[in-house]
Design a protein with these regions (language model features):
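Active-site-proximal cap/loop segments of hydrolase catalytic domains
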Residues: 1-143
Length: 143
């Protein structure tokens, strides 16, 4: 089974791959939030309260805390100009995966923001990357 998502959906993709590796074999996380405590506090606190009032919730919702569970194929996609989920937040996950010796793929679009829509052809490139990754790593037909 393959899964992909953008933003919060990217975080759900990471959680699915990391926590249910026997169920999810391929995932594409586009501009995910792997460390919610570093994400925009005003947005995060609407749904989760403050970190001080809900430490357990923040720990349980943070994909980075479950990265050791990765067994399948993972593609992480972001933009270096990201102002929503800053690239440093995603690089924290990338660094953790490297430290765990996990194999994964990583695509950074230069100077692109959360929508990855800046620059001629970027969105087409992103969509083609997603399609190609799924086709190469999750081919159709019985196994």
């Amino acid at each position: 089974v393959g899964i992909w998502g953008w933003s919060g959906g990217g975080s759900n993709t990471l959680n699915a791959l990391f926590r249910k590796p026997s169920d999810y074999h391929v995932g594409i996380a586009v501009v995910p939030k792997p460390q919610p405590h570093l994400y925009n506090a005003w947005f995060q606190e609407i749904y989760m309260g403050t970190r001080e009032s809900n430490e357990a919730g923040y720990q349980q919702s943070a994909p980075i805390n479950f990265a050791e569970g990765l067994k399948g194929k993972l593609l992480i996609v972001t933009g270096s100009g990201e102002t929503n989920t800053h690239i440093q937040i995603i690089e924290g996950l990338v660094d953790r995966l490297i430290g765990l010796g996990k194999k994964f793929d990583y695509m950074v679009y230069p100077n692109r923001n959360h929508g990855l829509s800046e620059g001629a052809g970027t969105l087409v490139h992103v969509r083609m990357l997603i399609a190609r990754y799924l086709l190469e790593n999750l081919p159709p037909g019985p196994r």
